[in-house]
Amino acid sequence: MNHVNVEEVEEQPDTVISKFLVKSFTAFVLFDIGASHSYISRGFVDKYKLPTQALRSPMLVTSPGAEYMASLWCDRLPLRIGNYVFPSDLIVLESQGLDVILGMDWLSN
C-alpha cells in the first residue's frame, strides 16, 4: 500500500482520489495501483456500524512508515460510482485519513 492519508495523496500527481458512496455513506476513496488489496478504515466502519467478519488468518499490511495487523474485513460492501454499484470486499485497517483504498484486487475485477 502506497498511501494512508489524504495529504500524502494530494501531493502525488499520479493518484486518483474522490468521494463515492459506500453503503449510502460518503467516503474518501483512493484508487491505488500500488496496493495489492483493498481496505476500509476502522473509523469509517465504526462510525457507520458496518458489518465485519474475521479474516481466516490475520494479515500484516505495510505502507511507507507503518505496519498494520488486520484481522477483520467487510464482505461485499456496495460501492457506488455514478450509476454503477460494485460489491467490494474490504480489509479493515486502523488507519486515519482515507476511508477506502481500492487496490489491484478490486481494480482487476
Language-model features and meaning:
Residues 1-109:
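Acidic, Ser/Thr- and Pro-rich low-complexity intrinsically disordered regions characteristic
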